[in-house]
Amino acid sequence: MDDSKPRPYSDISERLKWHREQIVEMNQEEYAKSIGFKRPAYSLWEAGTHRLSLDGALALRTKYGLSMDFMYEGIDDALPMTLRNAWRERS
């Protein structure tokens, strides 16, 4: 990725990438497909160059239990306990 590109949504992208790589262990193609999206759209969210869409966030909430507060704000209180603990214990 070109580091000179602005990444205004890098905080959101960090949480998405963590969940995809560390929790569900999928590549971008598989993860995007699992929530009904194509990889190019998902890739922009994870790159931090485009904001996660509401439809994308709702799909992630439905499929994986990720709370809106967690995805957009990093507030982990509403996550299922196993996800919350994993997020808090990450290195």
Model-derived features with residue positions:
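Residues in the helix-turn-helix
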Residues: 41, 51, 70
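Short alpha-helical DNA-recognition segment
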Residues: 23-47
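The alpha-helix within a helix-turn-helix
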Residues: 20, 32, 61
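Short, charged recognition helix plus adjacent turn
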Residues: 1-6, 62, 69-91
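Residues within the helices of the helix-turn-helix
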Residues: 17-18, 29, 58
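A short, Lys/Arg-rich alpha-helix, primarily the initiator
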Residues: 1-23
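Short, basic-rich loop-to-helix N-cap that marks the start of a DNA-contacting helix
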Residues: 47-62, 78
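Alpha-helix N-cap/N′ positions at the starts of helices
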Residues: 11-12, 37, 52
